[in-house]
UniProtKB/Swiss-Prot annotation:
Top enzyme class: ligase
Family according to the record: Belongs to the MurCDEF family.
A GO BP annotation: cell wall organization
Name of the encoding gene: murC
Name under which the protein is recorded: UDP-N-acetylmuramate--L-alanine ligase
Length: 443
């Protein structure tokens, strides 16, 4: 009898992608989660993966249990039931560590840019060679016969430590997750431990001072814009259609590349993809062709229009990510008003980075803040509010409520950049409904 894989917390971005992969490999897959809608569930529903509410009755001794990393006995009935009855289970990252052993695996790690870079690498490679992949936007593709496996490698709580891939990209090291990491030294230590796991090659952003500190058994190839980088981008052109550059490996030109994406960070993402593919011996003409057709990943600078109004949805929830997203918006829409609509994610992060949030939000023309979205792991001690953050922003800044987003209407031909990792999409939907009352041209 074919084994059934049960995912507790299947709507999580990594969990849903892994479930899709196993389903495509012909496995029996089901999962449970909150009944609230989350954008990752659409792909699961389209292929017929059963989605159940949390219930101890979902757990059977013969099932292979895969548990989301956020769940414990005290917050989930299924894991409590499994523990009580002695049923074995694996955490998401533990299962993934075993899964990748059957492939030549390529991880993408970094405080920022993991999902976009994983998506770009997966798109390019899967169009050239049989490649399975797991992307942090909930997208996954699985084929047991694939030669390569591309996946997102998360540093939070050192979840990437069970991973021993052949290769990895490291986009950057930055202090995030202040509820877990003590500071930048702690984060750097985690990346050093992960670097020791890599078997054949590390591709790291050369202008990151902490990545330059790493040592490893595998060779480290640095990429960037500087003369001391192994892989270097030159002749960079950024315009309203995207970005183009020439790529060099240790002084030798390996190709000209165009990426229909915006922001300096996406040029670096593309260069890291070029570096990996070049090292693997893939044809650079093929790589260039498929970079040109990359259309992004979910919730990363995702655009739509309501009449003349542009709405951009992005997962950005750290100052570095907000800065990159607003830079991308300026590149594509240099002559229009940039309106930032940001929901701070977790009280610990908002407290830790309040000044930095205010500084980068000033890159917009106008700023609106939604109420802080607290995580299930923390308690609001009323140490900071959205209004406190608004008071730090120099540009015009207001706090808006979900039941009244009408202040957002005060901008003609605005480019609205909705950013956050909580429920900012609810504000976005409310705004779209408000706009649609005066325009039916929803694209």
């Amino acid at each position: 009898m074919e084994k059934t894989y049960h995912f507790t917390g299947i709507k999580g971005s990594g969990m849903s992608a892994l479930a899709l992969m196993l389903h495509q490999m012909g496995k029996n897959v089901q999962g449970s989660d909150s009944t609230d809608y989350f954008f990752t569930q659409r792909g699961l529903e389209q292929v017929g993966v059963p989605l159940l509410p949390f219930d101890e009755k979902n757990i059977k001794p013969e099932f292979e249990l895969i548990i989301g990393n956020a769940f414990r006995d005290d917050n989930n009935v299924e894991i409590a039931f499994a523990h009580k009855n002695g049923f074995p289970f694996k955490r998401y990252h533990e299962f993934l560590g075993h899964f990748m052993e059957d492939f030549t695996s390529i991880g993408v790690a970094g405080a920022h840019g993991k999902t976009s870079t994983t998506g770009m690498l997966a798109h390019v490679m899967s169009n050239i060679v049989d490649t399975s992949y797991l992307i942090g936007d909930g997208t996954g593709r699985g084929n047991a016969g694939s030669e390569y496996f591309v996946f997102e490698s998360d540093e939070y709580e050192r979840h990437f430590m069970p991973y021993h891939p052949e290769y990895t990209i490291m986009t950057n090291i930055d202090f995030d997750h202040p509820d877990y990491f003590e500071g930048i030294e702690d984060v750097t230590s985690a990346f050093q431990d992960y670097a020791n796991n890599i078997k054949k090659g590390i591709f790291a952003y050369g202008e990151d001072v902490n990545l330059r500190k790493l040592s490893a058994k595998a060779p480290i190839y640095y990429y960037g814009f500087e003369a001391n980088d192994d892989y270097r981008a030159e002749n960079l052109i950024r315009n309203t259609r995207g970005s183009s550059f020439d790529a060099y490996f240790r002084g030798e030109k390996i190709g000209h590349f165009v990426v229909p994406a915006y922001g300096k960070h996406n040029v670096l993402n593309a260069l890291s993809v070029v570096a990996v593919c070049h090292n693997l011996g893939l044809d650079m003409t093929d790589v260039a062709d498929h970079l040109l057709t990359f259309r992004g990943v979910k919730r990363r600078f995702t655009e739509k229009k309501v009449g003349e109004t542009v709405i951009i949805d992005d997962f950005a929830h750290h100052p570095t990510e907000i800065e990159a997203t607003l830079d991308a918006a300026r590149q594509k829409y240099p002559d229009r008003e940039i309106v930032a609509v940001f929901q701070p994610h977790t009280f610990t992060r908002t407290i830790a980075f309040a000044d930095e949030f205010a500084e980068v939000l000033d890159h917009a023309d106008t700023v609106y803040l939604a109420q802080i979205y607290g995580s299930a792991r923390e308690v609001d001690h009323h140490e900071i509010t959205a209004q406190d953050l608004a008071d730090k922003v120099r540009k015009p800044a207001k706090v808006i409520e979900l039941d009244n987003v009408s202040p957002l209407l005060d901008h003609d031909r605005g480019v609205y950049v909705f950013m956050g990792a909580g429920n900012i999409q609810k504000y976005e939907i409310a705004f779209e409904k408000l706009l649609s009352q005066t325009s039916t041209n929803l694209q």
